Amino acid sequence: MSGFFITATDTEVGKTVVAGALAGVFRELGYNIGVYKALQSGHVASNPEGDAARLKVLSGVPTKEDEICPYSIEEPLAPRLAMKRAGRAVTLKDIIHHYNERLKEFNSLFVEGAGGLAVPYTEDALVIDFAKELQLPLIVVARPTLGTVNHTVLTIAYAKAHGLTVAGVILSGCKECEMERVQENKVMIEELSGVPVLGLLPFFEGEFTKEEVLESAKEYIMISKLEEFIRNESTVAHTSSN
């Protein structure tokens, strides 16, 4: 298996934009990559404002929205609570099954979590339990502003304590007028966590196009560093199968 698990320090930080943009860029580079978000609350999968629809558009995958996200609910709550209130029972086994179904279509998947790693996810697991099952390297998406050093370092420490590999951090929503502080936060995160900040993705104001997002990802994210992970994972997987 190869790909990335995209998590964040909080909700509404930019995971979907990052996950979709990275998948879109890698697909342009010729990689057979899909996207997967097991559970979504706040919108049903078919809603164009929801994460599943945005992942589909940004990545350019042919997968249907309800296959990208097999479990979705309208109420904007933590997934476990939203599903419980809707009378739906979703287990870790269920979402792993759908993950494996997507792997029949793609060589690699970029998997988006929900909120942060400690979010109650299925009825029997947190987001981090799902990440541990997949054993994909993490990309941590974080805010660029005040408070992000603490949130990001804690997220990385939590991931490492559970045996997960953190490929890097992407600060999302960076504004030109704040770049001096953003750069200071970048340096501090790297010093305190030992994990590289691989990108400073700009703030997208108002409506934006797929092309604008992908071009920004190419310009502001170290795609080559992430490509090394994909290649190394593919090599390990190939060696293990022989």
UniProtKB/Swiss-Prot annotation:
Which residues are recorded as binding substrate?
S41
Q: Which GO terms describe its biological process?
A: biotin biosynthetic process
Q: What does this protein do?
A: Catalyzes a mechanistically unusual reaction, the ATP-dependent insertion of CO2 between the N7 and N8 nitrogen atoms of 7,8-diaminopelargonic acid (DAPA, also called 7,8-diammoniononanoate) to form a ureido ring.
Organism expressing this protein natively = Bacillus cereus (strain AH820)
Catalytic residues at K37
Looking up InterPro entries in the UniProt record yields: DTB_synth_BioD, P-loop_NTPase
* Keyword Cytoplasm assigned: yes
Q: If you read the UniProt record, what top EC class would you report for this enzyme, in one word?
A: ligase
Give the chief site where it resides: cytoplasm
Protein name per the record: ATP-dependent dethiobiotin synthetase BioD
